[in-house]
Amino acid sequence: MRIFFASSDSIALEVLRKVSDHYNVVGVLTAPDKPSGRGLFLKVNDIKVEAINRNITVLDPVVLNSDVIGMVKKLKPDLMLVFSYGKIFRQEFLDIFPMGCINVHPSLLPKYRGPSPIQTAILNGDTIGGITVQKMALEMDSGNILAQSQFEIKSFNTSADIFRYVSLNSFNLVLEALSKLNKGHIGIVQDSNQATYCSFFNKQHRMLNFNLSAFEIKNKINACNPWPLARAKLDKDEIIFHRADFIKTTDYSDQAIGKIVSFDPSKGILVKTEDGILLLLELQRSGRKVVDYKSFYNGNRDLIGKIFS
C-alpha cells in the first residue's frame, strides 16, 4: 500500500515513524516553514524533519492548488492518512486516492468535531477522552468511524499530557483502520444528531477570572497548557500557570476571591475561588523557568495573603 501522509503537528510524529516502518510512505504533505524567535529565522516542523531524514518526498505548499494536485498524482498514492494537518481538503484533492482518505482525530466522534478536541474536553471537565480513525468526508470530522478507543482524563491532566498520550497510542488504531479498509469495511456511520463542535483556541483564552468556580479555573489552566498558557497578575508580575487541581471546600470562605490563602507541601499553593480552593501545581513568573509549587513557594516566601487579579 502506497500511503501519502499529511500533518503539520508533532502529535503525529510517532504515527509517521511507525507507518513508515510498516508501509511505503510515498510522500508527506506539511505546512511551510514559519518564522520563529526574535530573529524570525525559518523553523522547520518536526514532521518535515522526520520525512527528510527518511528520504520521503515532502510537499509544503501554502495553497493546495492544481500544481500540488499534479505533484501528488505523480507519487501514485493509494491512500492518504491525515493527522492534524490544519487545512480543509477540497473534493478534487480527496479524489486523488483510490482507497480514499483516513483521518486520526483525538476525540470520541461525533463528540468534539473541529480543531481543538483535546483542549475542549479538558476545558469542559470531561473524565473520558478518545481517539477516532475516520474515513474523510467533505463535512468536517463527519466520516464513517473505522476504529475508536477511549482513555481516562485525570483531574490534573493538561492538554500537553493528552497530546503525548494520543501521539503514542494512535498507531494501533491506524493499523486497525487500514486492515478494515483492506477487507472492504465501510465503517460505522456517525450519528450527526449527537455531534458537538469545538473551535480554535487562541490567546483570548489565557487570562484567568478568579470569580469562576475552582473547577472551571483548574480546567482552563490545564486546557491552556502547552498553549496559550493561562495567566494572571500578582502585584506587578505576570504569573503563568502550567498545571492545577482543585478542592471543593467551604474552608477560607471569609477570604477574598483570588487570594493566596495557604501553602500545603503535600497539595500545592492554595488560592481562594468563588466556591472552593484552586491548587496551583506548576507555575512560573514571566521570563523565568517553570517550577513545581514547592520550588515556587520557596523562592517567594511572601506569597500568602497576596491576591491575583
Curated annotation (Swiss-Prot):
Its EC number is 2.1.2.9. Pfam families: Formyl_trans_C, Formyl_trans_N. One of its GO terms (cellular component) is cytosol. Transmembrane segments: none annotated. InterPro entries: Fmt, Formyl_trans_C, Formyl_trans_C_sf, Formyl_transf_N, Formyl_transf_N_sf, Formyl_transferase-like_C_sf, Met-tRNA-FMT_C, Met-tRNA-FMT_N. It comes from the Bacteria. The keyword Protein biosynthesis applies. Keywords: Protein biosynthesis, Transferase. (6S)-5,6,7,8-tetrahydrofolate binds at residues 107-110. It catalyses: L-methionyl-tRNA(fMet) + (6R)-10-formyltetrahydrofolate = N-formyl-L-methionyl-tRNA(fMet) + (6S)-5,6,7,8-tetrahydrofolate + H(+). One of its GO terms (molecular function) is methionyl-tRNA formyltransferase activity. Coiled coil: none annotated. Gene3D superfamilies: Formyl transferase, C-terminal domain, Formyl transferase, N-terminal domain. Belongs to the Fmt family. HAMAP family: Formyl_trans (MF_00182). Attaches a formyl group to the free amino group of methionyl-tRNA(fMet). The formyl group appears to play a dual role in the initiator identity of N-formylmethionyl-tRNA by promoting its recognition by IF2 and preventing the misappropriation of this tRNA by the elongation apparatus. This is Methionyl-tRNA formyltransferase. It comes from Borrelia turicatae (strain 91E135). The gene is fmt.
